[in-house]
């Protein structure tokens, strides 16, 4: 069931606009570990595209044939359209990939699954939108297996315009397996320096940040079984 649209995901416009730069090292790592080098004949979907930064980065590194990014945030999608330049990307309002009426070779999402009430429904929707053998790469650090989640849940709830949900890594794996995907997973294992802020609400200690980016944050690869 499609959800109502919103203006922006983050209630703070300043924080909303800052997300792209903050997420760029993570996106680069996702691309490094999960994106094929040659995407020249591939169609790509970005689920929860926000202001469109991931697909712009992906195209600049590995040009694809075409891509669609979907999101329920109206202002973010409009911003993504303004920023896409010459790239063959179409940003649209929505949260149902199947409603796009086409199939994709590759799909991505970054920190989207914890914002969805029904993981199994998301798996079914993704399956409809992927060609047989196509892959969905989903990065996820907001899950109940992370020791930081109780703290983060409260913090994110203060800024998110939509509800957040408690999903475990096992729950996500089970939902996609039962929907007809082969499931594999690895730690993101970020290989970049990340700024540390003394007194950070999200990372009280340096070791919290190190653990999060080395083990808590994972990258799933769901391949639609032919």
Predicted regions and their residues:
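Conserved class I S-adenosyl-L-methionine
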Residues: 1-38, 41-50, 57, 137-159, 197
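Class I SAM-dependent methyltransferase SAM/SAH-binding core
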Residues: 51-97
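A conserved beta-strand element that flanks and buttresses the S-adenosyl-L-methionine
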Residues: 108
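A short glycine-rich, Lys/Arg-flanked "PGG" loop and its adjoining helix->strand segment in the class I
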Residues: 120-132
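A C-terminal cap/extension of S-adenosyl-L-methionine-dependent methyltransferases
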Residues: 151-154, 184-226
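Acceptor-substrate binding/catalytic loop of class I
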Residues: 154-171
């Amino acid at each position: 069931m499609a959800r109502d649209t919103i203006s922006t995901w983050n209630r703070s416009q300043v924080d909303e606009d800052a997300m792209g730069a903050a997420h760029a090292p993570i996106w680069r790592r996702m691309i490094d570990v999960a994106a094929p080098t040659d995407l020249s004949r591939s169609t790509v979907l970005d689920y929860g595209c926000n202001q469109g930064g991931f697909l712009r980065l992906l195209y600049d590194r590995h040009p694809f044939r075409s891509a669609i990014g979907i999101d329920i945030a109206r202002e973010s999608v409009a911003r993504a359209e303004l920023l896409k330049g010459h790239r063959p990307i179409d940003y649209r309002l929505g949260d149902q990939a199947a409603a796009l009426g086409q199939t994709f070779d590759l799909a991505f999402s970054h920190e989207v699954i914890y914002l969805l009430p029904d993981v199994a429904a998301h798996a079914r929707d993704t399956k409809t939108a992927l060609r047989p053998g196509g892959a969905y790469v989903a990065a996820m650090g907001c899950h109940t297996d992370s020791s930081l989640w109780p703290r983060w849940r409260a913090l994110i709830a203060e800024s998110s315009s939509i509800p957040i949900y408690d999903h475990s890594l096992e729950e996500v794996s089970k939902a996609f397996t039962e929907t007809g995907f082969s499931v594999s997973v690895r730690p993101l294992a970020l290989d970049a320096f990340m700024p540390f802020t003394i007194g950070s609400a999200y990372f009280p200690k340096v070791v919290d940040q190190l653990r999060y980016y080395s083990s808590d944050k994972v990258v799933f690869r769901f391949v639609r079984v032919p």
